[in-house]
Amino acid sequence: IEFDLWADGYDKTVGISDEENTYPFAGYKKVLGFIFQTIMRAENAVVLDIGFGTGTLTAKLYERGCSIYGQDFSSRMIALASEKMPNAHLYQGDFSKGLVEPLRSFRYDYIVATYSLHHLTDAQKSDFLLDLRNYLKENGKIIIGDVVFETRKNLEQCKLKAGDTWDNDEIYFVVEELRKDFPDLSFTQMSDCAGVLILD
């Protein structure tokens, strides 16, 4: 429900935080730009977006000829994204329970999650990412853009700096801890609190 209420003003909220270079969305445009450039290296990629929101990133990929599949738990977000991408295959579903059935029938060049997986616990994140690997094509990649920290200490420093604006309901990625399950992951930092993770 909260994301339905937030849907109309979501892009605006993100923009303000990014321009001011403040948590949580500092580096947001850099993150999306980096992911966009990575995916555009492949021609007509098949992309699954987990928690696509209003379709900010996927609409750009859609315009460039990518086949777009997606799952989001907000019907309002799906309605907004469908306006931008009428031929995309978008499904409603809670990804804390995994992928919805129709999306399990396909294989993807890229599975993308931007600012969505921090709603899962660390254990849920690892389980979900391990499961998502089963839906990649050969040489496919999972790309995550989110609030990410190299170490637990970096996270604590950001939390201190953010003060009252810190969201205690969100559980952010810590690279050194995620490497236990995904030793080959690559991490590119985009701001004090944002980065891109790539898993093969």
Which residues does each PLM region occupy?
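Conserved class I S-adenosyl-L-methionine
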Residues: N44-G51
